Amino acid sequence: AKEFKKGITANVLYTQIGAEEHLDHALRFFMSAKSAYVSGQAVYIKDNGDEISLVDFDETKPLKGKKILVTGASRGIGESVAKVLARDGAELYCLDVPASLADLQKVAGNLGGHALPLDITQTDAGEQILKACGVLDGVVHNAGVTRDKTLANMSAYKWDLVLNINLKAISTINNYLLTNNGLSESARIVCVSSISGIAGNLGQTNYAMSKAGVIGLVEATAKSLDGSARRINAVAPGFIETKMTGAIPFAIREAGRRMNAMSQGGEPVDVAATISWLVSP
């Protein structure tokens, strides 16, 4: 993938014997402009016995009738995810911290969704989500923070803050929703990881650990969902042009842009398009 010119992508689909009828969904995504920033990826397609019906499927509104929660939805990637999911027909519940309520209400209001101000690190966050949203068809765990320092200069507070928001909250909320009938039988969960969780990054030990943990959590949870129609996946974006990454020193930003397969930074909508595909039926 790294040998191609800009604008050319290469991915591979591993398909389990007997799962060929599930290929259409993936091929439509990878052959469309929606996958423009997805390259060098391996996707595994399995048949878990769930039935496929395209009779009433509307490709222009693939998420019509689906109730989906997006965390960290007041800005950046979360806001873009909310916009794309709304475009694709989803009923949205937009969640962010109470301090971002004004921005959150603006995003949710513009999309005809619901604003849910909530600190996801609260021990009863899962309970509050279920009470506010009811049974969900999808959850996008996008909320996350950085508190960058080299390991030698990392305070316990910054370490714990990043791990609690980026990883522990996801695990706690998923566990509550899965054990308290908070997810529909064919629900989709998508967790936002990062390339830092795969390759690490200088001065981001806490962030890299949290995002690596997200990948491990998804892989472990996927095994527990085996045999059901529920799905869980993670996306690990490379360098994405957001306000958060805009605060990174220029040299590091430029290195981040050049390290990915596309040799350029992505936009939040690129991540959003991939997430919309993963939460679609």
What positions do the PLM features span?
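Alpha-helical segment proximal to the catalytic Tyr-Lys
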Residues: 2, 36, 179, 223-224
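C-terminal helical subdomain
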Residues: 8, 12-53, 58, 234, ...
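Canonical Rossmann dinucleotide-binding motif of NAD(H)/NADP(H)-dependent dehydrogenases/reductases
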Residues: 62-93
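Conserved glycine-rich Rossmann-like NAD(P)H-binding loop of the short-chain dehydrogenase/reductase
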Residues: 90-104
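Substrate-binding pocket helix/loop in short-chain dehydrogenase/reductase
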Residues: 150-151, 158-159, 256
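Active-site helix of classical SDR
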Residues: 174, 210-213, 218
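Residue(s) in the substrate-gating loop at a strand-loop-helix junction
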Residues: 194
